Amino acid sequence: MLDGLKMEENFQSAIETSASFSSLLGRAVSPKSVCEGCQRVISDRFLLRLNDSFWHEQCVQCASCKEPLETTCFYRDKKLYCKYHYEKLFAVKCGGCFEAIAPNEFVMRAQKSVYHLSCFCCCVCERQLQKGDEFVLKEGQLLCKGDYEKERELLSLVSPAASDSGKSDDEESLCKSAHGAGKGTSEDGKDHKRPKRPRTILTTQQRRAFKASFEVSSKPCRKVRETLAAETGLSVRVVQVWFQNQRAKMKKLARRQQQQQQDQQNTQRLSSAQTNGGGTAGMEGIMNPYTAMPTPQQLLAIEQSVYNADPFRQGLTPPQMPGDHMHPYGAEPLFHDLDSDDTSLSNLGDCFLATSEAGPLQSRVGNPIDHLYSMQNSYFTS
C-alpha cells in the first residue's frame, strides 16, 4: 500500500517538473520578428523598434532621400521620413506664398486657408491685415474693405459699350447692385456724376506679356502679378483688372459659341422635319377622309353575313313560345322585306351615304335591338 502511494507521488512530481520545463522553453523560444520596412524575418543580433514595430538597422532610412535616420524620424503611412522632407510633403502650406508653415509659427486663418502673418495682406495695396480688420476673400485673394469698394465703383462705372468683353458672374452681380444704388440716389437728386477715370492703353509688348501669362494660368497668384507689373511698368491693380476682363471675355465667347451651335442644331432639325414629314403628312390628312365607299350589293351581302352569323346564338337559349313565327335565332334572312329592284338598292346606298360619318357600325340598315323589338310586337299582336 505504501509503495503504491510513493509511486503516484513520484509520477505527479515528474508531470509538474515537465510542465514547468516546457513553459520555460516556450518563454525562451519566441517567434522571430518581421521587419516593417522590407517584410523579412529579422535574424540580426540587434534591431530597432518604432511605434510597436520592428525594423532592420539598414531599413531605417528616409523614403524620399534614402538617407539613414539616426536620432529622429517621422512616421506616416508605414513609411519613415526625415524632418525636411516630411515638412515639405505633408506640412500645411501658406495660401499666399505656398510655402510650408512651421509648427512654431503664428498663422492667420480665412475660411479654409492658412496664411503667414506677413502674407496675410491685401493683394492691391499690400497692407498687412490685423485682427479685427474687414476684408474680402475673392478667388483665393485677400482684399481690404477700401480696395474692395474701389473695385465695385470701378466695375459700376464701366459702360456696357466699353466693356464688350463681358464680366464674370460675381462681377455682374456687383455691377447690378451698384447700378441699382445709383438709380435710387439719382431719383432723389442727391447723386452727382462721378468723373471717369483715365483709361489705360496697353502697348503691344505689354499685351503680349499678359496673353502669354494668361495662357499659362488664367488666375495668377500675387507673385506672378507683381513680376508682370515690374516687367511692363504698370501697377498691380491694372494687371489684376486686365486678367479679370480677359477671363470674362473668354466666358462670353464660350457662351456665344455654344448659343450659335444650339441655333444651328435647331435650324437643321426644323429643315429636316419639313423636308421629310411635311408633304407626306399633309397628303395623308387630305386623302384619309375620302375613302372609297363599297357598292350597295357588297353592303347588303356584308349585313346579311353579320346578322346571320353563329356568334349571335352563342350562350343564348331560344325562347320556347308557341307559333312558327317566333324564331329570333333562326336562319331566315334579315332583308326579306326588301325588294330586289334597283330602286331599293339605291335607297339603301343613300342611307349609307347619309350615315357614313357616324361610323361603320351605325351606318348599317338593321340592328339586333330593332329586331328584338319587332319580335316583341309580333308576339303581343298575335
UniProtKB/Swiss-Prot annotation:
Amino acid composition bias (Low complexity), ranges on this chain: 256-269
Compartments (UniProt record): Nucleus
DNA-binding region, residues: 195-254
InterPro entries xrefs: HD, Homeobox_CS, Homeodomain-like_sf, LIM_Homeobox_TF, Lmx1a_LIM1, Znf_LIM
GO BP, sorted A to Z: axon guidance; cerebellum development; dentate gyrus development; locomotory behavior; memory; midbrain dopaminergic neuron differentiation; negative regulation of neuron differentiation; olfactory behavior
Alphabetized GO MF terms: DNA-binding transcription activator activity, RNA polymerase II-specific; metal ion binding; RNA polymerase II transcription regulatory region sequence-specific DNA binding
LIM zinc-binding domain segment(s): 33-92, 92-154
Disordered: annotated span: 161-204, 252-284
UniProt keyword list: Activator, Developmental protein, DNA-binding, Homeobox, LIM domain, Metal-binding, Nucleus, Repeat, Transcription, Transcription regulation, Zinc
Keyword Repeat assigned: yes
PROSITE patterns cross-referenced by the UniProt entry: HOMEOBOX_1 (PS00027), HOMEOBOX_2 (PS50071), LIM_DOMAIN_1 (PS00478), LIM_DOMAIN_2 (PS50023)
Coarse class of the protein's main subcellular location: nucleus
Keyword Endoplasmic reticulum: no
GO cellular component entries: nucleus
Cross-referenced PANTHER family: LIM HOMEOBOX TRANSCRIPTION FACTOR 1-ALPHA, LIM/HOMEOBOX PROTEIN LHX
Function: Acts as a transcriptional activator by binding to an A/T-rich sequence, the FLAT element, in the insulin gene promoter. Required for development of the roof plate and, in turn, for specification of dorsal cell fates in the CNS and developing vertebrae.
Name of this chain's protein: LIM homeobox transcription factor 1-alpha
Organism: Mesocricetus auratus
